Amino acid sequence: MVISVLGAGAWGTAIAISLSGKKNVILWTRNKAIFESIKEKRESDKLPDCPISDNVSVKLAIEDAVNASVIILAVPTQSLREICHQLNDCNLKKNVAIILACKGIEKSTLKLPSEVVNEVLPNNPLAVFSGPSFAIEVARKLPYSMVLACQNEVLGLKLVSELQQENIKLYLSSDVIGIQVCAALKNVFAIACGVVLGRFGFNAHAALITKSMSEIKALYSAKVGDGNVDINTLLGPACLGDLVVTCTSLNSRNLSFGSKVANSNGSSAQQILSEGKSVIEGFNTAKSAFDLAEKLKIKMPICEAIYRLLYENTSIEDTISVLVN
């Protein structure tokens, strides 16, 4: 089986490295500088000391990345629709499975990644890949667990069998929507935890994570209906596991971003964002989650507080007052 990974950021490259031990992998990027750097050094600047094996073929033209059995989309959520249209223009075969490895909510439509893909590529089978997984640890082939969500059980079992390795434990789920809600919101809550980090102790930090779970459940319930909420999703690796690691580890880009915003000495969140080199998915998701909560008429005070901090320049003091009370 040939697997294509679209997106050569830290996460996409880490996935390619992780899967390349026993498989041929295509790694696609539209960034010529990244393409040339990886081709020359066989290493990503974002993943130092993590060599990229010869089993990984790096491509610059997307047409060269569609001849695969499985395509893993590890692109920023706000670029997902555009990439899917490019795949459609390449006459992507209908039997090619799409695995989503991106997290967030599309700002312009308030749709989850699977909803975007189903609009543009309705004939391709779809799965979602999510869980607690820092790119650097994945690239170093350290042990980790993930959830693969797929509504087609036969396809899901086949993908789990193909992707699971000695250091990767995959759990199969059919809860495509719930997994994505958890994956998107945890980045917003990580920013919130970064804001309070250093100002208060571990007790307040734990309370904030606990309240975050309540907001995840609220949006999850609004999307699927109260009777369809799966407790295994909420307590599994893709929700509780991912939330805990993203909200507590300094390797978390969103947590670090929240801390920088809280200690910015007057710089706006947009200024801090522009100075960084990494994608902060929680920044975009904060607005999308706030807008979606308004649309669905549910209360999400943590998301609202982070949205107002990032987009309306609410003071840190007022934001923290909401987060800790």
From Swiss-Prot:
<dbReference type="InterPro" id="IPR006168">
    <property type="entry name" value="G3P_DH_NAD-dep"/>
</dbReference>
<dbReference type="GO" id="GO:0046167">
    <property type="term" value="P:glycerol-3-phosphate biosynthetic process"/>
</dbReference>
<dbReference type="InterPro" id="IPR011128">
    <property type="entry name" value="G3P_DH_NAD-dep_N"/>
</dbReference>
<dbReference type="GO" id="GO:0006650">
    <property type="term" value="P:glycerophospholipid metabolic process"/>
</dbReference>
<feature type="binding site">
    <location>
        <position position="254"/>
    </location>
    <ligand>
        <name>sn-glycerol 3-phosphate</name>
    </ligand>
</feature>
<keyword id="KW-0560">Oxidoreductase</keyword>
<feature type="binding site">
    <location>
        <position position="253"/>
    </location>
    <ligand>
        <name>NADPH</name>
    </ligand>
</feature>
<dbReference type="Pfam" id="PF01210">
    <property type="entry name" value="NAD_Gly3P_dh_N"/>
</dbReference>
<feature type="binding site">
    <location>
        <position position="30"/>
    </location>
    <ligand>
        <name>NADPH</name>
    </ligand>
</feature>
<feature type="binding site">
    <location>
        <position position="279"/>
    </location>
    <ligand>
        <name>NADPH</name>
    </ligand>
</feature>
<dbReference type="Pfam" id="PF07479">
    <property type="entry name" value="NAD_Gly3P_dh_C"/>
</dbReference>
<comment type="function">
    <text>Catalyzes the reduction of the glycolytic intermediate dihydroxyacetone phosphate (DHAP) to sn-glycerol 3-phosphate (G3P), the key precursor for phospholipid synthesis.</text>
</comment>
<keyword id="KW-0520">NAD</keyword>
<feature type="active site" description="Proton acceptor">
    <location>
        <position position="186"/>
    </location>
</feature>
<feature type="binding site">
    <location>
        <position position="253"/>
    </location>
    <ligand>
        <name>sn-glycerol 3-phosphate</name>
    </ligand>
</feature>
<keyword id="KW-0963">Cytoplasm</keyword>
<keyword id="KW-0444">Lipid biosynthesis</keyword>
<feature type="binding site">
    <location>
        <position position="252"/>
    </location>
    <ligand>
        <name>sn-glycerol 3-phosphate</name>
    </ligand>
</feature>
<feature type="binding site">
    <location>
        <position position="103"/>
    </location>
    <ligand>
        <name>NADPH</name>
    </ligand>
</feature>
<keyword id="KW-0521">NADP</keyword>
<keyword id="KW-0443">Lipid metabolism</keyword>
<dbReference type="GO" id="GO:0005975">
    <property type="term" value="P:carbohydrate metabolic process"/>
</dbReference>
<dbReference type="GO" id="GO:0008654">
    <property type="term" value="P:phospholipid biosynthetic process"/>
</dbReference>
<keyword id="KW-0547">Nucleotide-binding</keyword>
<keyword id="KW-1208">Phospholipid metabolism</keyword>
<protein>
    <recommendedName>
        <fullName>Glycerol-3-phosphate dehydrogenase [NAD(P)+]</fullName>
        <ecNumber>1.1.1.94</ecNumber>
    </recommendedName>
</protein>
<keyword id="KW-0594">Phospholipid biosynthesis</keyword>
<comment type="pathway">
    <text>Membrane lipid metabolism; glycerophospholipid metabolism.</text>
</comment>
<dbReference type="InterPro" id="IPR008927">
    <property type="entry name" value="6-PGluconate_DH-like_C_sf"/>
</dbReference>
<feature type="binding site">
    <location>
        <position position="186"/>
    </location>
    <ligand>
        <name>sn-glycerol 3-phosphate</name>
    </ligand>
</feature>
<feature type="binding site">
    <location>
        <position position="281"/>
    </location>
    <ligand>
        <name>NADPH</name>
    </ligand>
</feature>
<dbReference type="InterPro" id="IPR006109">
    <property type="entry name" value="G3P_DH_NAD-dep_C"/>
</dbReference>
<feature type="binding site">
    <location>
        <position position="103"/>
    </location>
    <ligand>
        <name>sn-glycerol 3-phosphate</name>
    </ligand>
</feature>
<feature type="binding site">
    <location>
        <position position="133"/>
    </location>
    <ligand>
        <name>sn-glycerol 3-phosphate</name>
    </ligand>
</feature>
<feature type="binding site">
    <location>
        <position position="135"/>
    </location>
    <ligand>
        <name>NADPH</name>
    </ligand>
</feature>
<comment type="similarity">
    <text>Belongs to the NAD-dependent glycerol-3-phosphate dehydrogenase family.</text>
</comment>
<feature type="binding site">
    <location>
        <position position="242"/>
    </location>
    <ligand>
        <name>sn-glycerol 3-phosphate</name>
    </ligand>
</feature>
<dbReference type="InterPro" id="IPR036291">
    <property type="entry name" value="NAD(P)-bd_dom_sf"/>
</dbReference>
<dbReference type="GO" id="GO:0047952">
    <property type="term" value="F:glycerol-3-phosphate dehydrogenase [NAD(P)+] activity"/>
</dbReference>
<dbReference type="GO" id="GO:0046168">
    <property type="term" value="P:glycerol-3-phosphate catabolic process"/>
</dbReference>
<feature type="binding site">
    <location>
        <position position="131"/>
    </location>
    <ligand>
        <name>sn-glycerol 3-phosphate</name>
    </ligand>
</feature>
<dbReference type="GO" id="GO:0005829">
    <property type="term" value="C:cytosol"/>
</dbReference>
